[in-house]
Amino acid sequence: MNITSEELLKEARALEPQLQQWRRTLHRHPEVGFDLPHTKELVKKALTEMGYEPKDCSKAGVIALAGGKKPGKTILLRADMDALPIHEDSGEEFSSEVPGKMHGCGHDMHTAMLLGAAKLLKAHEDELEGTVKLEFQPAEEIFQGSPDMIAGGLLEDPHVDAAVMFHVLAGMPLPVGTVLVPGSGITMASCEQYHIVVKGKGGHGSTPENCIDPITAAAHIHIALQEINSRELKPGDFGVLTTGRFEAGAASNVIPDVAQMWGTIRTTDPENKTGELIRTRMTEIAQGVAAAFRCTAEVSFADYCPCMVVDKPLAENAMDYMTELLGKGAMDMTALTGGKPGGGSEDFAFVSHEVPTVSMFIAAGGPEQGCCYGQHHPKVRFDDSILYEGSAAFGWFALRWLHDNADIAF
């Protein structure tokens, strides 16, 4: 390996106009879930122009290979591509042109960063002591993209020995471009969706005595569920139960037949026993409270995503490599978290349960840059001046890790 970290960072900085163009084009045209035709077209076109042969993977993923000219390990670099089903109100001049859809989590940033890394790695392909697999993933927001691509052969042909992801952070008072490197072990919570359907008997709002009101029952269920955390979990056990959507009826003078609520369960229990307890008690409480109000309740669960597990040697590598590249711009994340897992979830966790993995974060703007809101808010903004650092970080990690592990048998 001949290139230095300073040289790679300089090359990445020269890509800034292209990185910004990719990111802002994606931002204007957000797509959600697995339905990403225009996003995939941009990614595949860019990769092809660089000299890659991109391939489809499963429902909507894209993969490409760099290196392979020298024997060695294979490292996976991943970017997610999907947006959120929310209406943008950021005020950016390149805001979403698609009503009800927005890149509010920064996946447009990730995609542009990995495309930049692809360009850097192609320029230094002869120096790669192994293979880099580039993964552009759909459907992260619904926790289905990663398991779908794994089922489609993501981690084989060639077999992946290590995996890396970066995620941008907005709205945090950190120096722009700071890379946060986590400790090892569980760093992010598991997540599971729930859906509760409460059925009663509808009728005119003036005659509640002739009805069985599902809204009243559902409201009491929502309140009762909050007692699970305080009364049923052991002190120190992490569990979050949040109802984020509640729907019932369509008119102010009509008691509906049905009320529904949707939400998430998050835990940091690797065996998910805490999650099992919460699910069991949710079902019992919902059905019991509903019965008290002469209603019935159906409770279902879906889209489970496990905890993120960070490999200790990779986390140590990450701190070393990011310090080489960015100096004081690399920060030990445990200084902020106290070593405790975060409550957010990420479907790259599925990969972390299959191969050694590290997930890092990049500060992409705080209040000083006008980025006052966090992810998933309609007003969130991201400072795309950090894109080149993200590309360099992806590229430098791959170059260094393959070099360091060229002669190591796993």
Region locations from a protein language model:
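Divalent metal-coordination and catalytic microenvironments
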Residues: L26, L77, H107, L134, ...
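Metal-dependent amide/peptide-bond hydrolase catalytic core
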Residues: A219-F410
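Acidic/His- and Gly-rich active-site-bordering loop/insert found
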Residues: N2-H103, D108, A112-E129
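Electropositive phosphate-/nucleotide-binding environments in soluble metabolic enzymes
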Residues: N2, E6-L9, R13-Q20, G33, ...
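Histidine/acidic-residue-rich, glycine-tolerant segments that coordinate divalent metal ions
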Residues: L84-I86, G91-M102, D108-M109, L121-P256, ...
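Non-cysteine beta-strand/loop elements that form the S-adenosyl-L-methionine
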Residues: L76-R78, H87, Y194-I196, S359-A364
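Structural motif
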Residues: K73-L76, V132-K133, V160-V164, A330-M331, ...
